[in-house]
């Protein structure tokens, strides 16, 4: 689950991470009533969307007066912001964040994530803040350092000496960066986050370190422990199909292709998307129905897939383990009859009761194209949508 920058800063502030003073506004009138709370010669107006690259897209503006800030607010609210992370359709700006400007001496990058190989937190630090960390890794690989955290030693395992040795930072700078990192780590653990990114972490002319921008994402599997975080969810920032899928226990991610996919198991789903691409087409989605899908779940999955107008064909790829292929086949037939599916439908069943499942499909009287192997199924659906 993702949240807005202003929400991330509110959380970080509670854990004593220094952030600029600011407020959120959902209308120009609201901004006008609150603008006098800020006492700074420079104000920063930021569009609040769940995507990076706002600055290059015109979603971050520097104002030299309250009046100019209000003009930026009026011009920003309601526009559709297109960045490298939003996709071509962009995201509508429904709220803006206005904060006091900071005197910037140097920009750094600091984040904490879960290292998937080690299954433990790791800090990423760079002396090149303010730009995508992927670009830094590509163009300045020597300016990034990874600091692993040992759960047994907790934050005491944060090796600040690496920062000193690699980036030639003073003891005072190291102490302040370490303090910020400690508070970020506390936030990370307490909120069950899976990423906190500060980009940039700025050193001001007075020598202080401030989180000028902040991004936090949380582990969906731990949200039941944090109802206060769930309340921060902004459904306007999420894909409607993904919201609907989550209501039915489905894992769905919308993509830009035209072949809908319904698969059980994340690994098999990714393999299915890969083979579709291998044969020259593009998947329209990732959809994992899980190991305990019912007829009702399959029907909902079809509804979600077909709600995407780009879908020109559907590939169902099921391996029956816990989930029986005959149950899935019955669900497919029931859904196809009830929804009058008009796009080509290729189904590949393998595993528990797959022969029963194939008979159910064959005897349904529906125009369902059967396949025994994934390779065969992919070629058939690609041919159908060409």
UniProtKB/Swiss-Prot annotation:
EC number: 6.2.1.5
Keyword terms of this UniProt record: ATP-binding, Ligase, Magnesium, Metal-binding, Nucleotide-binding, Tricarboxylic acid cycle
Binding annotation for substrate: 264, 321-323
One Pfam assignment: Ligase_CoA
Alphabetical list of SUPFAM superfamilies matching this protein: Glutathione synthetase ATP-binding domain-like (SSF56059), Succinyl-CoA synthetase domains (SSF52210)
Pathway as given in its UniProt record: Carbohydrate metabolism; tricarboxylic acid cycle; succinate from succinyl-CoA (ligase route): step 1/1
Cofactor binding mode and count: Binds 1 Mg(2+) ion per subunit.
Single annotated GO MF: succinate-CoA ligase (GDP-forming) activity
Binding annotation for ATP: 46, 53-55, 99, 102, 107
PROSITE patterns, A to Z: ATP_GRASP, SUCCINYL_COA_LIG_3
GO biological process, any: succinyl-CoA metabolic process
Domain ATP-grasp: 9-244
Cofactor: Mg(2+)
Catalytic activity: succinate + ATP + CoA = succinyl-CoA + ADP + phosphate; GTP + succinate + CoA = succinyl-CoA + GDP + phosphate
Keyword Ligase belongs to the record: yes
Physiological role: Succinyl-CoA synthetase functions in the citric acid cycle (TCA), coupling the hydrolysis of succinyl-CoA to the synthesis of either ATP or GTP and thus represents the only step of substrate-level phosphorylation in the TCA. The beta subunit provides nucleotide specificity of the enzyme and binds the substrate succinate, while the binding sites for coenzyme A and phosphate are found in the alpha subunit.
Quaternary structure annotation from Swiss-Prot or TrEMBL: Heterotetramer of two alpha and two beta subunits.
Listed name of the protein: Succinate--CoA ligase [ADP-forming] subunit beta
Naturally occurring in which organism (per UniProt): Wolbachia sp. subsp. Brugia malayi (strain TRS)
The organism's taxonomic lineage, starting at the top: Bacteria, Pseudomonadati, Pseudomonadota, Alphaproteobacteria, Rickettsiales
């Amino acid at each position: 689950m993702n949240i807005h920058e202003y929400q991330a800063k509110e959380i970080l502030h509670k854990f004593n991470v220094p952030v600029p003073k600011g407020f959120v506004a959902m209308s120009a009138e609201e901004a006008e009533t609150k603008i006098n709370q800020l006492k700074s010669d420079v104000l920063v107006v930021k569009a609040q969307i769940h995507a990076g690259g706002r600055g290059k897209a015109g979603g971050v503006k520097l104002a030299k007066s309250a009046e100019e800030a209000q003009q930026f607010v009026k011009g920003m609210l309601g526009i559709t912001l297109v960045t490298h992370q939003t996709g071509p359709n962009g995201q509508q700006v429904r709220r803006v964040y206005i904060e006091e400007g900071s005197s910037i001496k140097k920009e750094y990058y600091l984040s904490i994530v879960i290292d998937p190989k080690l299954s433990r937190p790791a800090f990423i630090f760079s002396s090149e803040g303010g730009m995508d960390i992927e670009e830094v890794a590509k163009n300045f690989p020597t300016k990034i350092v990874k600091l692993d955290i040992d759960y047994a030693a907790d934050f005491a395992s944060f090796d600040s000496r690496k920062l000193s040795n690699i980036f030639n930072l003073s003891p005072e700078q190291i102490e302040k960066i370490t303090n910020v990192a400690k508070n970020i780590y506390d936030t990370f653990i307490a909120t069950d986050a899976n990423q906190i990114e500060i980009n940039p972490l700025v050193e001001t002319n007075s020598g202080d370190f401030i989180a000028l921008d902040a991004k936090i994402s949380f582990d969906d599997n731990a949200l039941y422990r944090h109802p206060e975080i769930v309340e921060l969810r902004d459904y306007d920032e999420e894909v409607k199909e993904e919201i609907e899928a989550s209501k039915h226990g489905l894992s769905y991610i919308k993509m830009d292709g035209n072949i809908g996919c319904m698969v059980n198991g994340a690994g098999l789903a990714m393999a299915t998307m890969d083979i579709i691409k291998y044969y020259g087409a593009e998947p329209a989605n990732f959809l994992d129905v899980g190991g305990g899908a019912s007829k009702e779940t399959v029907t909902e999955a079809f509804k979600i897939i077909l709600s995407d107008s780009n879908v020109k064909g559907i590939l169902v790829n099921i391996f029956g383990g816990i989930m029986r292929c005959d149950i899935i086949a019955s669900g497919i037939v029931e859904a196809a009859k009830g929804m009058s599916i008009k796009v080509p439908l290729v189904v590949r069943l393998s595993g528990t009761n797959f022969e029963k499942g194939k008979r159910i499909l064959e005897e349904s009287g529906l125009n369902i194209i059967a396949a025994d192997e994934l390779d065969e199924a992919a070629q058939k659906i690609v041919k159908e949508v060409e």
